[in-house]
């Protein structure tokens, strides 16, 4: 596992990143500056910064930041301004918007149609070239810059007057894993670890080696299918940040209350729940986890054990990882004397050995320092959407037997 190559300085790492991942990296302090005033997902913001600010020249960076601000101000669609933008589109005949676009095939008339999330438009005709070229449009949708035309035709009252002239994704439309692996080879293991940590906004130079690996372990549910992960620790250590802000493929269930229909399967609508729609379902504040259904926790245990669950007459399978994060308000020593390390869980989960057996990894959150300004990086890292997409691609590769090369597990482990 060790890499004997000589470690490079920050400048060397930056040069290697620019050479091998140009357009896919961004200076993280720029994200912080613009994010404060822009109500737009981090991964969209960083994609734009990666396009216009991937340089060491301060003038180029300044011009790029101004361009990104202008693009967001002029084109980003806020849901409460949807009608105003449609009116501008009608008056001028054309307008460019930034919105989340989902495309589906209408099999009745053999054509593709696009839905706009914030703009509220449904079934807008879209050329076949876009879903063919950008398959993520068909798999849950991606954020795009879209040039729209408005042309009302008296004879075609049933159709929509809105047409898509051009569509450009502002998320990674596709990630080439082979290209990533080729680029990875020019970095040592330590350098690559630092790059990954900077990509999620952390500064590795102020962390110990163990703290680095603990932070990296938070990414496990995003790269492994059906991985059950638990982290309990003090406040202000960023336990839920990764699942809420960094990856567009994970969802954070705040407050803890949920239903079997919402999480697993809705019998009335015949639709799959969160575990079928997301790569990772994270529960914030485990102390508040409650199911309105009596059989909720039992169904969750079945899913955590096998990756499937029974609803009605059929069994459904899904690949989402389950993450449980929560706060420990006492010291660990006191907790171990008075109860257990699973004390923050509701009793029906924290004292159920069948549930605890299904947890693959318990991350000791008390070993991660409380975050201060110096813990956040101003250096280069991958744009979050690129990081999230290559983590999603890694879910397709199996590493379940990798541990056998280094360890032999006893028979008493299940």
Place the predicted regions along the sequence by residue:
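Extended, charged/polar low-complexity intrinsically disordered regions
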Residues: 2-199
